[in-house]
Amino acid sequence: ATVTATTPVAAHPHVWIDAAPEVIFDEQGRVAALKMRWTFDALYSSFALSGIDANKNKVADPDELAMLAKQNTDALKDFKYFTLVRKNGENVPFGEGVSAENIVVDGALVMTLNLPLAEPIDPAKHHMSFASFDPTYYIAISVKDASAVSVVKAPAGCAAQYSEAGEAPQNVSDSVVNNLSDNWAAQFAPTITINCNG
């Protein structure tokens, strides 16, 4: 029941995620990593949690949650973890050490992805932004508003700026999605820009 698995639904999106990103700075005032906290919708959460219940005790045990986190991390690698980071308009790769943890909160599956950048970015010197989206639009990822974004160890004068995107359409047919460009879903993804005025 990985996040990229198909389900028998005729229209996109199939899964909904509420995202709460954290921007992690290092001691040099550079952005070193992103931490993406994803809360899955009730239907997918139920489906995924029942699918990992190997011992049939109707409880998501720590080892079962860890197994699902590993499966999702492996599956998301080819999709760049549904997270596009840009430095001066150029795509930035993630580095080694990507990891994930799962917990259950009020019945909802919550996955936290730890995404270290291949090279830290100094947002005082470079324009940096990121957005989260599934290019296949199988999954709709939303960042509620600016309050959902946080920064950790940010230097004085550095903050995350939230820019709303266009309202994402619902019930897009599979046949339509299959003929869309890879960048189509990006237009519905809120963009987070890191501004440093200090």
Outline where the language-model segments fall.
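Domain-scale selection of a single, long terminal region
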Residues: 1-2
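Boundary at the C-terminal end of the N-terminal hydrophobic targeting segment
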Residues: 5-11
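Early extracytoplasmic/domain-onset interaction patches
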Residues: 12-40, 44
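Residue-level detector of beta-strand face positions
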Residues: 22-23, 84, 129
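Short, hydrophobic/aromatic beta-strand segments
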Residues: 33, 46-50, 123-129
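Structured domain cores in non-transmembrane regions
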Residues: 43-119
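Mature, soluble, non-transmembrane domains
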Residues: 87-198
